[in-house]
Structures are given as structure tokens and as C-alpha cells.
Amino acid sequence: MSEEPPSDQVNSLRDSLNRWNQTRQQNSQGFNESAKTLFSSWADSLNTRAQDIYQTLPVSRQDLVQDQEPSWFQLSRTERMVLFVCFLLGATACFTLCTFLFPVLAAKPRKFGLLWTMGSLLFVLAFGVLMGPLAYLKHLTARERLPFSMFFFATCFMTIYFAAFSKNTVLTITCALLELVAVIYYAISYFPFGATGLRMLSSAGVNSARGVLRI
């Protein structure tokens, strides 16, 4: 059996090494191309998202105000304070008339209920003028405020309905009293520790009622 000359073995080994180097270079180039393509697409996507975010960011204080309130709700702080005071004065006038003219209005409880309801609505809506309509609407529909909001506006509308349309004196007086409770709760809840005190009083009242009724 004849052996290959050393020169042939060297050439064969050199050819094998060259082929291996070429294969490795091709694989490396393919990996580099795929990495470049992946990085380029990722960079383009990131750049596009950054441009979208930049375009949606407010560039001035006016943009922030427009995002919060529509143009017809935009009032200056002075205008809101003036309207707030006007609403409070209107509510005070209604409550004062109800108090001093109670002997006269007692004979006409439906008119008393309407006047009291008007004062209650002016009192509550005054804070809406001060905070802004959308912000106040979110405040009233918050989880901790929603039960009160539903109770208060339900009693107001029921008082108006029974006083102006159904003309039921007993139900008008009942709804007006419930409305008074809602307004007092609303006013006290904004005092320091007012909400905590109301919860303590309500829980104590419920416990006392359960003790009396043996529930």
C-alpha cells in the first residue's frame, strides 16, 4: 500500500483548513447580517415610538389645561372664585329665606322644598365651579364619594318631583329632610377629621340601633 507524499498531505491539510475558514467566515457574515437587520428594525421601532410619545407630550401649560378641561370650561382663578362666592351667596340666601320664612312656608311645604333644594344644589355645585366641571365630576363619582352623590342628587330630584309634579306634601317633606342630612354630611366631611368623625358617629348609631332592636 503506497503512502501519500508529505507534500500531498500538507496540501490536503491546507485545503481542509481553508475550507473550514471559509465556512466559518460565511457563518460569521450571516450572523452579523442577521444581527444588523434585527438591531436596525429594533432601532427603527424604538425611534418611531419615541416620536409618537414626543408628539403627544404637552409643550406648554396651555396644552395641559386643554387636556383637563374643554375650551368652554376654561376659566381663570379669579372668575372661578367669583362664581364660587356667587353660588355660595345664592345658597345662603335660599337657606336664609327658608329659615326666616318658615312660619309662612310651613303652610306651603312644597314651595319650601323647592327653595331648600335650590339652595342645596347651589351649595354643592359651588365646589364644582371652583374645582372645574370635569375634575369635580370625577371627584363626585369616585368610589368613596359615589354613594353620597347618588343619595344627594336622588333626594334633590325626588324633592323637585314630589313638590312640582306629584304635589305630594308628605313625600316632599321627607325628601327635603333626607336632603338636609346629605348636605350636612357633605359639609362636615370636608372639615379636618370630619369624615372620620362621621364614620365613628354612624357606626355608633348603627350599633345603638342594633342594641335597641336586638339585631
UniProtKB/Swiss-Prot annotation:
Superkingdom classification of source: Eukaryota
Keywords, sorted A to Z: Acetylation, Golgi apparatus, Membrane, Phosphoprotein, Protein transport, Transmembrane, Transmembrane helix, Transport
An example Gene Ontology biological process: retrograde transport, endosome to Golgi
Residue spans, topological domain Lumenal: 103-111, 167-172
Recorded topology in the membrane: Multi-pass membrane protein
Additional facts recorded: Present with 279 molecules/cell in log phase SD medium.
Protein name (record): Protein transport protein SFT2
Organism expressing this protein natively: Saccharomyces cerevisiae (strain ATCC 204508 / S288c) (Baker's yeast)
Lineage: Eukaryota, Fungi, Dikarya, Ascomycota, Saccharomycotina
Gene label: SFT2
